[in-house]
């Protein structure tokens, strides 16, 4: 009898028991992450910004709101106090006048002069240039002239007295300074164009004058302003000058003008409490332009040295406005000037403000910021480049 072949035994699969995983829970319960959830990176310490970043932001953009107490953190002062001076003024080209000349300078109190304006034609009708002076009234910076111990302005060319530093600071310097202009005309009357260049000042006494901060001819608080009489740039061909910019007046709102440092080291300007003057020699008062021109004398030079930050360059803007004949639709170009000057001071020990000064700490990047600014020769840059 034949043997039968045995069948192989069928193996049964044994499944291992699944190990339970304990999920983490929070007080709000368990939440499973989905594909749309953000990925959380492990913390390796909280990054902090440099304590000097806000100061450098204002140096690169004068209108920056990073801080209202901007400094140049280079250790140039042991301690200092900063001020942010700003004003907005509208100027219009005078009737039957041509080109408007605007100069912005690093001067104390009145940083801008613009010629051939309606205000200049009204207040200074006898002056050839019919200038307007744009200053910072009521912002804690200014000078006074005293004759016989009494404040007097305007002065006479026969007076003898003192120019008093009313703010009582011993040293100062410009942290940054800028200007924004907007054409305030309707679309049908927005023609006109502008040219702009930056230039190195020739360091001449006659380029500086003293005038009222409020732009009038009688305000007792005065400041140093650029004096455009005799400035060669007004009649020069500026197209070939470094940094030349031009454009339409309707587009000038897109630009920002600012002064640049001329070197990597920015020394403070020293100013004395009081400087004696002799009328007609140290200060020559011009009854037509309502200003006192600095004389070519020792006192005139001392005033110039204490009232101008010579570490900064100057700005010249030549404006070709719409004609102003006084007729309907021919009333010229209305320009809104928003100008700012960020200053750093060191006050005299006997000043009440001396106790508010804080340490000027040094950041090695300060010189690099200066170099970065003065490497840019452009007289104007688009506002978006400052953001």
Swiss-Prot record:
Subcellular location: Host nucleus; Virion
A GO CC annotation given for this chain: host cell nucleus
Compositional bias (Low complexity): 370-379
Span of the annotated motif Nuclear localization signal 2: 30-37
UniProt keyword annotations, A-Z: Host nucleus, Virion
Keyword Cell wall biogenesis/degradation: no
Leader sequence residues: none
Motif (Nuclear localization signal 1): 8-15
Protein name: Capsid protein
